Amino acid sequence: MNQKQKNIIERKTKDFCEEVKHLKLTEENKRIFNAFVYKRSKPYKFEIIDKYSNTIRFILCTNKLDDGVLHILLKHYQGKIGSVSATEILNLCEVIRNGEISVKENTMVYTLKQNGQIFKLIVALKKSKT
C-alpha cells in the first residue's frame, strides 16, 4: 500500500467514525464498525442465514487492498463507483439476509433493492473444512 492510499484510508476512517457516532449499534454493527476502524490483522468472521435458509460464513479481511475493508474504504465509501455510506456498510449483513442470490463462477452475489438503491455484496466461494 502506498502513502497516498494510507492517507485516504486514514481520512475515510475518521469520516466513517464521525458519520456513525450518533447511532445506536447492534452487536453485529459493532463488529463491522471494529473491522473498519481498528483493522486488526486477523479477519472478522461472520455467520448469517440468508432468506433461502443457507448458512453463509464469510470473513471480512482488514489488510487486503483487493477485497474487504480496505477495498470498500478506497473504492466504495464516499466513492464514485458503487458509493455507500457508513450506515449502509454497517448494515451489509442485511444484503445477505434479505437479498436475491445469484451464483457466478466462484462467487455468490447478493442483491438487495432498498429505497430506490441497489446494493450488491459479493461473497467468494471456498470449500468448507468441515
Residue ranges and their predicted role:
Residues 1-130:
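Ribonuclease/tRNase effector modules and their secretory precursors
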